Amino acid sequence: MRSFATQQNGIFKSVCSLDCPDQCGLLIHKKDGKIVKVQGDPDHPVTAGNICNKVRNMTERIYDEKRLTTPLKRTGAKGQAIFEPISWKEAIDTITSRWKQLIDEEGAESILPYSFYGNMGKLTAEGMDRRFFYRMGSSQLERTICSKAGSEGYKYTMGISAGIDPEETVHTKLFIFWGINAVSTNMHQITIAQKARKKGAKIVVIDVHKNQTGRLADWFIPIKPGTDSALALGIMHILFKENLHDEAFLSEYTVGYEELREHVKQYDPEKVSTITGVSTEDIYRLAKMYGETSPSFIRIGNGPQHHDNGGMIVRTIACLPAITGQWLHTGGGAIKHNSGILEYNTNALQRPDLLKGRTPRSFNMNQLGRVLLETDPPIRSLFIYGTNPAVVAPEANKVRQGLLREDLFTVVHDLFLTETAAYADIVLPATSAFENTDFYTSYWHHYIQLQQPVIERYGESKSNTEVFRLLAEAMGFTDQELKDSDEVLIRQALDHPDNPHLAEIDYDSLTKHSFMKAKREKPLFPGELPTPSGKIELYSEKMKQDGFPALPTYTPLVTDNEHPFMYVPGPNHNFLNSTFSNNEKHIKLEKTPKLFINTKDAEKHGIVDGAPVRIWNSRGECELTAAVGEQVLPGVVVSQGLWADEQGKKQLVNALTPDRLSDMGGGATFFSGRVQIEKV
């Protein structure tokens, strides 16, 4: 492994660590040992030197004076963020002595790790940490907050988390961005779409909010939250009725198309219009456009899956390319995630065999508040890393109430004293990605990339792998698996004979090339999919066995209160979840947290554009700035971004979101809450 950290000057290849599908190649400019500029790598075949504003300003985050430099011990009340510096030895001794006591008195399951992909590096997010907590026998975490519902739904149809190669979409003639603000969250897919548009391609956006991507589209279609499956079924109704389907493809590569043809007769445009808020004329127009344009491509976003019915929504949308046979056309098909193409050896990396036959209890991360407040026997210690649940998790007020428990020993490993860290007993300083050894796999394009250390550690910060090696040693765990170096971890993860796409990729080749493309000798079709039938399952017997309708179906959202407004807290352009929300430059770019309200609703409630507005339900309340217009349908309100706590302001939007779980995969239902609004 080469390390550029000791080299004082130069330009070095790197990779973006953010939880973003684009996983950009970077060039890091150093002078006198410090990063002075972050630039896109023009040699990367997909991202091609073009990077977002977040990464362009990454230097300010790396050298932010608010970064933690030493371990901290709480000296004030929980939540007040009053700490004193301590040594790493004291921190590790304090943590492990408490854990040993808890294990002796209450068992290892009284301890719970809580983490996610704030850094998408595989060692950082799911390497030595998994080994450590498996070895301990702690309670386990179901990490389902982001894409699990959609992944499960997509797999019922397609059998694998894979779609087409996005590089092929330069040939696409119709792009449908469905529930994704790609300008802000998948910018290079937009770049490709714009290239195709110069050759005549059309861009359609279906979303609850006319955001940056909606404004770029040739045609924006607003839709009521959680009704996407009804729209997809209405499109199928017309495709079959108007003979716009591909009978040969359906016969050869799918199962259940005859049953589906009969099933969708009930989803006529008039019925679907009532459900979705999309006019019958637009439903016809969209279906005709989709049925008559080839190749067509659907980019399925994360938005639709964050509903009570999110898995079924994605399962249903995933059926559409099969109806018109798009998978046989270069540039045709869909992408939800492409993580299946770059699937590495998770068993070798995470080593679940260290459980040694134990089956500890597990908890869904979306329900952290109720886990901390209601579990019996209780969780007595929480180790949090790679996430900021006091801002990011649903029912955030309940989460913070749980973190206030005096009998809860909480450790946070982070770059900053986050809102979550304010409740910790011990805080550990974390390295940035540019200080780590790691590897990254995109969940959109087909390239895997290696991260080599570019700069020296900031202060006394340590990487996740280093922290868990120290904890393992202090706990008396002598297993070699808990001593493996970062290089060994990467070698183990990339040794995956079951995935032929990685056949020519290993640690040595990645070290030489920095990034490499997965090997894909044949297209998705013709071929055999890993569904029970080996085909696209429009009718799924597996779904029936699992308690779901065998055919794609629309089911309404849960009504948890009688408030009149559906509330969708979407992402914004200059933050990534809570990352960058503490950076003054990014805050100034976003200006203020807004609530988008339809003109008719604003008039009814006496709310004017730019005025403060109270948004509330039984879970909590916020005060945001009204953005009045036609960006959302009547009965829908939308905010953008997860804003950092600020004295005297009520902008914690996840105080309003439910912690119910989605229909499939135990996913989050951020976008299925209801609220009331009123002028302040």
From Swiss-Prot:
PANTHER family: OXIDOREDUCTASE YYAE-RELATED, TRIMETHYLAMINE-N-OXIDE REDUCTASE. The keyword Cell cycle does not apply. Residues 9-66 form the 4Fe-4S Mo/W bis-MGD-type domain. Keywords: Iron, Iron-sulfur, Metal-binding, Molybdenum, Oxidoreductase. Belongs to the prokaryotic molybdopterin-containing oxidoreductase family. GO terms for molecular function: iron-sulfur cluster binding; metal ion binding; molybdopterin cofactor binding; oxidoreductase activity. Its EC number is 1.-.-.-. Binds 1 molybdenum-bis(molybdopterin guanine dinucleotide) (Mo-bis-MGD) cofactor per subunit. It is an enzyme of class 1 (oxidoreductase). [4Fe-4S] cluster binds at C16, C20, C24, C52. This is Probable oxidoreductase YoaE. Its cofactor is Mo-bis(molybdopterin guanine dinucleotide).
